[in-house]
Amino acid sequence: MKRDFLGRTLAVIEDLSVEEQMFLYEKTRELKQRWYSGEDVSDFRIKKRNVGIYIVFVEPSTRTKESFINAAKFHSGPNVKVNVFDSEHSSFNKQESYTDTFSMLTGYSDYSIFVVRTRLEGVCRLLERRISEFASRNGIEVPSFINAGDGKHEHPTQELLDEYTFLEQNGFDNSFIHVALVGDLLHGRTVHSKVNGLKIFKNVKVDLVAPEELMMPEHYVEKMKKNGFEVRIFSSIREYLDQKDVAKIWYFTRLQLERMGEDILEKVHVLREAVTFKKEYLDALPEGVKFYHPLPRHKVYPTIPNFLDTLPLNGWETQARNGYWVRIVLLSMFGGALEAPFDTSKKEEKPEEDFIIPAPITHGSKGVQKEGKRGIKPIENGTVIDHIAKGKTPEEIYSTILKIRKILRLYDVDSADGIFRSSDGSFKGYISLPDRYLSKKEIKKLSAISPNTTVNIIKNSTVVEKYRIKLPPTIYGFEELRCKNENCITNPAHGENASPSFVRNEKGQFICEYCETPHSFEEIWSI
């Protein structure tokens, strides 16, 4: 049974299970207590030989970068070298890909831990996959990657220190938490990480306090509800304090003007007013409230104004210091210094659900002949794809037929297609492929292009096999796939030659596996 965390990646907070996160928090608590009482903490230091810790910040940062540098220096010694990567004068400026850069860096140590911050989203997930393959090819130990913030996607190590700080305030009781998230919930990646980070608490109540223009994206709100959180929404601090059930943990974020469009910037004064705390609000707060903030604060327009610095409300200073301790422990785990009392193997993927379902065959050849009478010549042998985009308009159906032909390369000379009216009055598409049998792989591809179709295998003018195809749980491996997020690492403009892949959620949306942007089925296709 694996008990170490070597080779693990933290791209999103869910890459650590709740059990693994709680282990990290308990070890952080232990480290702090032993450090401040003057006890030996050497067992937290990485002892594995020839380890390289690389701090690679392609996006500027002060707190996160310095926190990680100092956490890495805690481990620095004969066995561990700390490298602060100068991205401004690096091969990135020579248009080298992330994959090539990190492949070469991986070869300079027996084992590597990379701490990566980028404007592009999903970089650590890409590196986890690509560099694992590189390491396997070259007999190198698979490295670890830690996401130190990627665009407006996630900031999992900030989430770790936030949750640790919340636990401290709660006396390390994780039975319940009531937290208010206040500020720019649209662009703030730290609040996006809380969608899953708060799952360490058994009962969760979240109040979202932001005007509509800055409200948390709907797919994150839905995910909170799916996680069992009670979620309430308020448009301003004033509205929030007008009701009596006020949280004792407030988590503020700054307005990220650099990520906003012109339409939002025109309203910035009104938006800022809605989420900035004022002196007049103090009397409405319940006893024991603490304010937190991932920092930095805007020096002119802080959502937590400076008059609060000296009040007992100030929890953000302790929160910031906790980042050092949490990141030391995270590096201890990923560097092999700390082992868990439970299995730390990466959990197996769920088996893919069966989405190609054999269907009963009725009237063997009758159905084929029937289609022939409506304009398509019946075939003796081959494949008939039926019920294409059933219920859609003729224009949409024909577009789907063209998509199927292009992606599956169904350019057979004798093939035919058409649009017919079903017995229920709706339209459906139809492709007839004489002497051509679709392979199982092609049928799987078809399910991704046009779900809910029917595939008929015909021999001697008789339907001998029939399949009904459902929407697959994952879609990948097509050149025509595109993530609509321009900042996703898979976007062709970024030159990483990364193929998008999508996972279907319970609502039928397809979530990019790199940046977690939700898409409709139609949106994932570039044709």
Curated annotation (Swiss-Prot):
The EC number(s) attached to this protein equal 2.1.3.2
Q: Which stretches of sequence are listed as region Aspartate carbamoyltransferase regulatory region? A: 368-527
Q: Which UniProt keywords apply?
A: Metal-binding, Multifunctional enzyme, Pyrimidine biosynthesis, Transferase, Zinc
Q: Name one GO molecular function term.
A: aspartate carbamoyltransferase activity
Q: Name one GO cellular component term.
A: aspartate carbamoyltransferase complex
The family database entries (SUPFAM superfamilies) matched by this protein are listed as: Aspartate carbamoyltransferase, Regulatory-chain, C-terminal domain, Aspartate carbamoyltransferase, Regulatory-chain, N-terminal domain, Aspartate/ornithine carbamoyltransferase
Q: Which GO terms describe its biological process?
A: 'de novo' pyrimidine nucleobase biosynthetic process; 'de novo' UMP biosynthetic process; amino acid metabolic process
The name on file for this protein is Protein PyrBI
Q: Which organism is it from?
A: Thermotoga maritima (strain ATCC 43589 / DSM 3109 / JCM 10099 / NBRC 100826 / MSB8)
Lineage summary: Bacteria, Thermotogati, Thermotogota, Thermotogae, Thermotogales
